[in-house]
């Protein structure tokens, strides 16, 4: 499993436009610029890859890191900085499986999977949304994956456990969570 952190910045990127906090000032002084959260996971055994979350910086991230377009996507929650890059797949993929949690969020009365289907219906069969139960492992790209609930109010948010069943290598990550995991 080869993991590429495409973006690790804040919701608005780091540094944030117009922000004078210590983090943003230090980033400017050091010439550091971080795009929003997204992770590329390549299964070197199968040659397939998956993308964790679709940052609005999708295009720039893929150009900067020279990684393959994903064979599948995973969406952890519906905040714009984790989902709104999904529209970038238009003309790039066909039938991309996009796995998302099926648990209904009381704040929205929809699951992440339902929100993607509604919000990105214009993508037609460019994507295929796959609703997944939290804690229920599933296979994609030759990897075993499961969504795990994490605390990130006010919306339901999920972390991931990704396991290479052949080697036992394990990746656990969450894009957003509070300190109370």
Predicted regions and their residues:
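Binuclear metal-dependent hydrolase catalytic cores
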Residues: 1-180
């Amino acid at each position: 499993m080869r993991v590429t952190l495409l973006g690790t910045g804040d919701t608005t990127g780091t540094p944030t436009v117009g922000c004078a906090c210590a983090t943003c000032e230090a980033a400017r002084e050091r010439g550091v610029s971080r795009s929003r959260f997204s992770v590329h996971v390549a299964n070197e055994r199968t040659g397939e890859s998956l993308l964790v979350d679709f940052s609005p910086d999708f295009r720039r991230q893929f150009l900067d890191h020279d990684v393959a377009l994903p064979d599948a996507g995973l969406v952890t929650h519906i905040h714009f900085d984790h989902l709104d890059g999904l529209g970038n797949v238009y003309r790039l993929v066909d039938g991309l499986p996009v796995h998302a949690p099926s648990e209904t969020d009381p704040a929205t009365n929809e699951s992440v999977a339902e929100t993607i289907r509604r919000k990105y219906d214009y993508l037609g069969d460019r994507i295929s949304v796959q609703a997944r139960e939290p804690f229920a492992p599933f296979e994609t790209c030759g990897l075993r994956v499961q969504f795990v609930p994490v605390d990130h109010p006010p919306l339901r948010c999920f972390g991931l456990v990704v396991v290479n069943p052949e080697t036992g290598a394990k990746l656990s990550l969450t894009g957003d969570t509070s300190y109370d995991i």
